[in-house]
């Protein structure tokens, strides 16, 4: 059996490994476990082959399940934002969770983080654990200021919510009541389908729900039909509101078409921003407003959405351009998107560009004029002229893809791959719907670290260091050395978690392995580890001993405080080692007073033989260690007396040399007054090396200890444990002083604002030759192997509307970051001709028509949009339901994320699109002048732009 009567480690490992493979089933409950705790458990049970040597090592015993790293401070059930599966937490089914809790218990004061499995997708169903719950605000109709917040699963029903509200506000079951959705403009919507789920009802994060109780006379406070409901399709008692749009102030006809906001359904600003940009793309909007989409709906395309996305989008666009509403609530559109793209089904913040990509692809497939796609064998260039290969590629593309989306948004680029081994050149031409442009990356990042100096009286100092993003631990030490004066080669960098060393880094390890939430401690060690053979660096952890209960003599221990590193002589006496350890902790270990000394001897534990202690306080080789032993306490045993401090106050082997006091360091001599007076030891110590208590030490009359270099390694799994009796710890160990630290002025440092970059710089970076990464190689048909080839992209032809995605977000296993670089992009006359390699391409000039903005950091923040109205040619700012005028000087900002450019020869009045030609012909026949949002002199560029079109 393992600790505390738990199953043996082989059984634990086998059971959990099997349960981790459990398939998700709708309605099942799964539990979140902090990945750091789980990794510690895996080490303890030897889950992975490389951890087998630690199996059963009591010094890596994980202790109670600790999920505090997943929770917001002060909230036992609220998760931190943007947690990532496998990186921050792992998911366990109910049976697995119950087993772990029975074996290890749950940290006191914590509650299980239980989540339901929900089903997503309309046609292709798949299950997903709903990690983030929907937070709803609940109140009574008679007192809407008294709001109570509760969290629900999307799988919970309206009936479940009503029962919870009744419980909160003490409303008896027999009392007739009804629920309402309350929106921001004081509009209400009935919730009268008790079996509907939160997901089906479209309830979103932060939604206010109101319960209304029936009056004694049989009437309702809000009346038989709510007068404040502003829904043109509203009716009672049928529950149709889930499928309809909510409109503000219906019946008005004095709103300018297109100047219509979109209500935020709860973290749906990303969707609103994308829709506003597409809505203000003139050729696409005219296509839908003139019902041209109806004759091109493709209901049978297996890659499409049966026309549902196109129809839902068309309905929304018609409402936005009707001129009747100042804003609409796009719930029906949101529901359709969520059904076909489950990643957008919830109410968590998403990426605007990812939604745009899905929407453009969905509209394309729903409106694809090709009813049966032919199979086409793709060909490599094989030395043929670019013009021939490009025309072939575009023709092949049109044989399978022909829609209004292709007409407006698709272009063609050339991709060239060169094998580094055989020099094989592969050239292909591929269509694109938008350009994702890289931004010049920040080459540096800031890290906050704590420097622990060798002087035991010095508090740890917090520093902010600037290090290369693609660097190693030595770069961190070099930067810290410049601020602190401590030589980089005298530093050891560690990651401390849960009172133990989680990692001890080598100098050549990558900085990318350090995450933002890691607690990085750098220790000053005054020896040269490569040359000094007389000393050894050992990690030291602190443990508090305890008994499992008053009914048993079994003892255990738990980690506390901050671990530390220290250099000690390789050959030492037990007494000198004890004094060195006590000296290292003299800042926060209080010494006894004369009164305390005469009160009686200090007892460092109730029994010197706990955990197999020998008479000298050193654990015997091979003895049990950290958590528990089967040996009973011997209440009559007495501790051995610590030799007089005077006998050991001058240690020839103490690290630091004779000049420590001159250098301001605390030494045994300068701290003698602090150390004197103890007749009994405050703690005992035990060695642990890679899971075994087998570090060689020589036990003779002088009680010498020898650290064997063949066995001892500087590693987070090798350490010296200092075991404290609870009473002595409480009496002499000052935990507040131990946790205290100082801040260096660098912590307040804010990096200077970066200069802007031009959009053309990003385009040049996009077309720059690069070497493929090791994780993304190219298969060379000549070598018959995957190679890290060089790759170059070039633009061949550009579409009428060019969508430019600025790649502000970067992801890696250890880091998530947003680049806030200011990109200077032109409002008009963006000349792309210099980037086209097609020799027949003439000048291609574009004007900006819309911008999607993102404010805030990685994974959160807020989306808005700037857009130019096609009817009056003026700029407007769209912020969810709010629409306001904007000026051109507001548009270029660090928030710009997705840019929409329209080629000058395709604007209304040029007759470029068939619909525009029809409108132009009708205008000529009636004698009505044609309005254009471009000056007449822009037509001078028409001939120049003709050659910019596709080579089909």
UniProtKB/Swiss-Prot annotation:
Its EC number is 3.4.19.12. Residues 627-644, 931-945 have a biased composition (Acidic residues). One of its GO terms (cellular component) is nucleus. The keyword Nuclease does not apply. It is found in: Cytoplasm; Nucleus; Mitochondrion. GO terms for biological process: BMP signaling pathway; monoubiquitinated protein deubiquitination; negative regulation of antifungal innate immune response; negative regulation of transforming growth factor beta receptor signaling pathway; positive regulation of RIG-I signaling pathway; protein deubiquitination; protein K27-linked deubiquitination; proteolysis. PROSITE patterns: DUSP (PS51283), USP_1 (PS00972), USP_2 (PS00973), USP_3 (PS50235). It is an enzyme of class 3 (hydrolase). The modification Phosphothreonine is found at residue 573. One of its GO terms (molecular function) is transforming growth factor beta receptor binding. The modification Phosphoserine is found at residues 932, 936. Residues 260-904 form the USP domain. Residues 597-665, 923-952 are annotated as: Disordered. The modification N-acetylalanine is found at residue 2. Residues 7-118 form the DUSP domain. Phosphorylated. Phosphorylation protects against ubiquitination and subsequent degradation by the proteasome. Keywords: Acetylation, Cytoplasm, Hydrolase, Mitochondrion, Nucleus, Phosphoprotein, Protease, Thiol protease, Ubl conjugation, Ubl conjugation pathway. It catalyses: Thiol-dependent hydrolysis of ester, thioester, amide, peptide and isopeptide bonds formed by the C-terminal Gly of ubiquitin (a 76-residue protein attached to proteins as an intracellular targeting signal). Highly expressed in testis and spleen, and at lower level in other tissues. Hydrolase that removes conjugated ubiquitin from target proteins and regulates various pathways such as the TGF-beta receptor signaling, NF-kappa-B and RNF41/NRDP1-PRKN pathways. Acts as a key regulator of TGF-beta receptor signaling pathway, but the precise mechanism is still unclear: according to a report, acts by promoting deubiquitination of monoubiquitinated R-SMADs (SMAD1, SMAD2 and/or SMAD3), thereby alleviating inhibition of R-SMADs and promoting activation of TGF-beta target genes. Belongs to the peptidase C19 family. A homodimer structure has been reported; however it is unclear whether the protein form a homodimer in vivo. Identified in a complex with the COP9 signalosome complex (CSN). Interacts with SMAD1, SMAD2 and SMAD3; the interaction is direct. Forms a complex with SMURF2 and SMAD7. Interacts with TGFBR1. Interacts with SART3; the interaction is direct. May interact with RNF20 and RNF40. May interact with PRKN. Interacts with INCA1. This is Ubiquitin carboxyl-terminal hydrolase 15. It comes from Rattus norvegicus. The gene is Usp15.
